[in-house]
């Protein structure tokens, strides 16, 4: 009996499981794609074109958006905690009510970005970007209850 149980257990453990594998959308053109409300934890969007895509209300913790084109992309109400946004292009992107805590945004381009209610806690941003964001920063993140201005440390620049 032990042998049968052990054999079944070994077979189950060696079967591939999509729930354990992160989704890889790297180097794809996903213009206008609708991922709204999706669980995309750990997904890879490396160098992916997500222009006009809907990623609102998504769980994107630990995802990679390195070099992604996020022009006019809706990321509102999403969890982008610990996300890699290095070298990404955010132009007209909606980050309202988004949690970006502990994310990486080195060499990220930000233009005309909506940030009302966004949480930037522990996100290293160049001072010129912080100054630009502080001009329009307002709101409180509904998930972390932190004020956007406080997370950008607007009072200290």
Locations of regions flagged by a protein language model:
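N-terminal hydrophobic targeting signals that begin at the initiator methionine
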Residues: 1-2
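Tandem repeat scaffolds
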Residues: 5-6, 11-157
């Amino acid at each position: 009996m032990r042998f049968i149980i052990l054999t079944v257990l070994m077979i189950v453990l060696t079967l591939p499981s999509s729930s354990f594998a992160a989704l890889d959308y790297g180097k794809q053109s996903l213009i206008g794609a609708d991922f709204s409300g999706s669980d995309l934890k750990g997904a890879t969007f490396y160098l992916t074109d997500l222009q006009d895509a809907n990623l609102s209300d998504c769980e994107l913790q630990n995802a990679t958006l390195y070099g992604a084109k996020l022009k006019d992309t809706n990321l509102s109400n999403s969890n982008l905690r610990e996300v890699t946004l290095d070298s990404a292009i955010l132009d007209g992107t909606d980050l309202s009510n988004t949690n970006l805590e502990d994310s990486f945004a080195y060499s990220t381009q930000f233009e005309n970005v909506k940030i009302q209610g966004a949480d930037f806690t522990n996100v290293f941003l160049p001072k010129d970007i912080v100054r630009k964001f502080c001009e329009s920063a307002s709101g409180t993140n509904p998930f972390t209850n932190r004020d956007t201005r406080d997370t950008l440390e607007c009072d200290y620049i």
